[in-house]
Amino acid sequence: MAGPCGWIASQGNFWWPAAYVPPLLIVLSTALAYTIRLGLMTLRASRELARLPRVPVPPNLVRNAQAAGIDRIAYVGAGSPVAFCAGLTRPTVFVSEGAVATLSEPELLAVLYHEADHARRHEPLRRAARTAAAEVLTFLPIVGWWSERQIARSELSADAAAERVVGRSALAGALLVMTAPAIPLAAFVGHAELRARRLLGMGIDEPKPPRAVWAATFVYSWLALSLAGCLFEVVVALRP
């Protein structure tokens, strides 16, 4: 590997393993940053969830949650119609009082089956891992693009699971009623426009990463490796 510092050629045969040091430094520092970022995201989400005003779950919600295969359900005292799945190790479906009061029985079931699919697939953990990776690997724009694409796929998959049970009409009605929560989690209304296109029978093309994303990923990766090489050259030069 030859970066702008040209440090490899200056090390001689004895230092040939040094060629692996810059990539290793990037991997280790990225892994550390990723672990810290994921931990901070988990801590923040836990604090936000702890602040939610929880109230006893009404019998009809318990019954519908059991029908949807939801093991853990939480009832939130909020007037806005909100539902989301949260919890990295023990996914829990949160439903607000406003959602139960506003939605019809089939629409409520559509929401519950949608969120049950997220819980079954451990979507909160997957989404947190992808988001943390995209934020840490900012020099790899392709990671952010891939993360957003996977989130969209998970929403479409959850919709398909709900539609198979309650039908398209109930799912569409729920999508019109529900709102987004303040916490950036696996909420029911995520990627609403894309999901509406599917419900309307409109074609959804499988997007490909733009060339600009690939180009930026290549350039930023090269710059990161070159910078790591330069830093390593400085360390080698300063060694006794």
Can you describe what each PLM-predicted range is?
Residues 93, 128-144:
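Hydrophobic, aromatic-rich membrane-embedded alpha-helical segments
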Residues 95, 114, 158:
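Divalent metal-coordination and catalytic microenvironments
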Residues 1-75, 205-240:
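Hydrophobic or amphipathic, alpha-helical segments that drive membrane association/targeting
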Residues 109-113, 117-121, 185-221:
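Membrane-interface, cytosolic juxtamembrane amphipathic helix immediately N-terminal to a transmembrane helix
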Residues 96-110:
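Short pre-active-site segment immediately N-terminal to the catalytic Zn-binding motif
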Residues 71-91:
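Catalytic zinc-binding patch centered on the HExxH motif and its immediate surroundings
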Residues 116-133:
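Catalytic Zn2+-binding segment of zinc metalloproteases
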Residues 50-57, 142-206:
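Short helix/loop segments within enzyme catalytic domains
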